[in-house]
């Protein structure tokens, strides 16, 4: 088992690595060269660098993830793709993502993308997520602990 972190979209990488270390589980941080920081690396954290091209990190994560692994990502399409592989997917707010939860999220993501690409509407009126909080960080660590103990 390993914890794979989508390094381009996930905050609190250090806390995720520490949680893995506590249980003897290594973390693999997949990130573009643009987001790399040596501060994250130690004997329990390995960086896998990818080119700074669209979906490059997502493809690498899909190739690395095996049954029993935990992936931490905020990427909705990536979460959806990982559902078939018996991988536990957790977002940075501590929500464990399931396939049945994903369908509405994927539909919304697709519609928003179509609106943005059309260029007809500059602002969709859709707001981004609320500010990341200490409660969110606590939920993330709790979800990781639960996933580690449950596998």
Regions found by a protein language model. Give the residues of each.
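Nuclease catalytic cores that cleave nucleic-acid phosphodiester bonds
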Residues: 1-151
């Amino acid at each position: 088992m390993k914890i794979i972190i989508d390094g381009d979209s996930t905050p609190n990488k250090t806390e995720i690595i520490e949680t893995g270390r506590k249980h003897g589980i290594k973390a693999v941080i997949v990130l573009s060269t643009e987001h790399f920081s040596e501060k994250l690396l130690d004997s329990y954290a390995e960086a896998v660098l990818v080119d700074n091209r669209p979906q490059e990190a997502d493809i690498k994560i899909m190739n690395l993830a095996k049954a029993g692994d935990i992936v931490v990502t905020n990427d909705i399409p990536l979460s959806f793709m990982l559902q078939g592989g018996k991988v536990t997917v957790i977002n940075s707010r501590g929500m464990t993502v399931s396939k049945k939860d994903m369908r509405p999220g994927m539909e919304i993501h697709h519609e928003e993308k179509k609106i943005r690409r059309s260029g007809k509407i500059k602002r969709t009126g859709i707001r981004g997520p609320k500010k990341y909080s200490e409660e969110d960080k606590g939920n993330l660590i709790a979800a990781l602990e639960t996933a580690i103990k449950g596998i």
